[in-house]
Regions:
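Acidic/histidine-rich, surface-exposed loop or edge segments in extracytoplasmic proteins
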Residues: 1-6
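Extracytoplasmic
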Residues: 11-41, 46-80
């Protein structure tokens, strides 16, 4: 699946602060902090298609996020 990465930091606290800001600015609850040493990465969504993630990328840019980008990664899916 795909997620939108909006932030990367070397400390968990900085990533948590960014996640909290994103929750308010983008009105989403599906915001995750993924630790890929040495960085904590703030990523949004559980998108099955790149196109859906790109829609959120465009919205994030309008909200002031300068360099959001789509990443292919494992996502959480709900059972059908």
């Amino acid at each position: 699946g795909f997620r939108l990465q909006i932030f990367s930091a070397s400390t968990r606290q900085a990533a948590e602060d960014a996640r909290n800001r994103a929750k308010q600015q983008l009105s989403r609850d599906d915001i995750f902090i993924d630790f890929e040493p040495p960085y904590f990465k703030v990523r949004i969504g559980n998108f099955k298609t790149r196109k859906d993630a790109e829609k959120l990328r465009d919205t994030a840019k309008k909200q002031g996020y300068e360099t959001p980008f789509v990443v292919e990664t494992q996502i959480q899916t709900s059972p059908q």
